[in-house]
Amino acid sequence: MARKVLFLLSIFSFLSFSSVFADEPSAKEGDGFIENLDKSIEEKFEPISTKIQDIVFYAIPVSTDADGNPVKVPWVLGWLGIAAIVFTVYFKFVNFRSWKLAFQTVKGKYSSSTDPGEITHFQALTAALSGTVGLGNIAGVAVAVGIGGPGATFWMILMGLFGMASKFCECTLGVKYRQIENGKVYGGPMQYLTRGLGEMGLGSLGTMLAFLFAILCIGGSFGGGNMYQANQACSQLIEVTGGEVSFFSSNRWVFGLIMGLAVGLVIIGGIKSIAQVTAALVPFMCGIYMLAAFIVIFSNFGEVGNAFGLIFQGAFAPTAVGGGIVGVLIQGIKRAAFSNEAGIGSAPIAHSAVKTKFAASEGIVALLEPFIDTVIVCTTTALVIVMAGTYDDDTFCFCFF
């Protein structure tokens, strides 16, 4: 199966890039090779991405704003939100009553060096967090507050708390249905969709869904997981090295190449190498960011109470920005989903490599992710933004992109 998938992806990549280079001769004279390549790739993939976006983010009208315009909810957000609530109730609020056990498990209290797997609970947690703590906590929160007002923060926190149950479920399944061959762990939605649904007599459906997930996961990792991050990092580098006159302004590909090589050095060693790097990098990264945020907050400590007041008031105010309460709620759920990836299926791939005999133990550890990512980091970001008081500026959201 893996060879067939690899073969299909290879053919797809070959045809895509062949068509890209086939268009090169028609480029305008004087244009650079990289510029032409960028334009060609965009022209080839934009129709595909647009169609996928129209399907995935198909919006259902649920209300109207003050001007009578419909307020729409993307069906995928409703699916994620309802699933998170159902899991919370079904597992008797595991996301609220298992914190102590989660921290004990992360510290290795119930671990043994002989347990099957490749990485520790802490390494698995940081490996998964490395993919969620980032621009979603900064620009994502800024967009939520800029569009939905301070009240979006409340719904973002609430979605983060319920999302802990979704993370618990998917990561437990990732360990339960993983396969270990010659010391190497293979896990994630590809495994539990195939094997789990197979046990229910739905093997064909499971195989099809696993195949689709693998393809879409690769696409998502290229876009939101890599291109978005690299683009924003490059933009910041250009800004601090001279702006338009910076070397990287006209040679962005150089930055991309450097970043690609740096990432390649890490991932070429597999999950063990990735986990070792993230175990050292993620705590430092989060610590530096939180320290900077706390300096801002404590420097303006007198505004903290007012900021929380605006958050709670905006969450339930009928005249809230962007379509009333429903509009604010949508913004909060959107940014929480983008930030913590609860229910997306990416985290189980990292968590399935953990050393443990009990699948649910890693699910307990995984539920800490949305709490750290959304409830702590995103809330801190929102406080800084609300205290600054610039979120209602018309140009506020655009300064992040």
Regions found by a protein language model. Name each.
Residues 3, 79-82, 87-103, 213, ...:
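Membrane-interface loop-to-helix entry segments
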Residues 23, 168-178, 182, 292-310, ...:
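Extracellular/periplasmic helix-exit of transmembrane alpha-helices
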Residues 268-279, 284-357, 369-370:
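Membrane-embedded translocation segments of transport machinery
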